[in-house]
A protein has these predicted regions:
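Copper-binding active sites and cupredoxin-like electron-transfer domains
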Residues: 1-149
Length: 149
């Protein structure tokens, strides 16, 4: 459906909003804005601070491949941070922060842990981390191969 003017869709938009069922849940304004060529970049050993703000709905951020070394769920750096969280909680209408030191190279996925929103609606960001693999942290015991059976 198309509209001639920017306000012409108001009745249809309000009808969708009344259902409280989002059609998009995105990071940085649009689906895919922080994946592929637009992925965030980091290097092994770098500490990265993630700020997560949520307007209307609660969110459960999670870094697949890592975790929150330091997490300020309510966003106040004056408060003592929680440590080593897999997933944390950001209340609707608030913001929080998480710091993580990348220890291995690879592609990490920062998601809303409601994975339906992450995968189908766009709440995913990627961090491409460059550097040398550290076998002291994790060793590959068998090379990747096709699954048989």
């Amino acid at each position: 459906k198309t509209y001639e003017g920017s306000a012409d869709n108001m009745a249809d938009a309000l009808e969708v909003m009344r259902g409280l069922i989002p059609t998009h849940v995105v990071f940085n304004g649009k689906k895919g804005s922080m994946t592929g060529d637009n992925a965030l970049k980091a290097k092994v050993g770098e500490k990265v601070l993630f700020i997560h703000a949520q307007a209307n709905r609660d969110s459960r951020p999670h870094l697949i491949g890592g975790h929150g070394d330091l997490v300020w769920e309510a966003g106040s750096f004056n408060d003592k941070p929680d440590t080593n969280l897999e997933t944390w909680f950001i209340r609707g209408g608030s913001a929080g922060a998480m710091a993580y030191e990348f220890r291995q190279p690879g592609i990490y996925a920062y998601v809303n842990h409601n994975l339906i929103e992450a995968v189908l609606l766009g709440a995913t960001a990627h961090v491409v981390v460059e550097g040398e693999w550290n076998d002291d942290l994790m060793m590959q015991v068998a090379k990747p191969a096709p699954i048989s059976g």
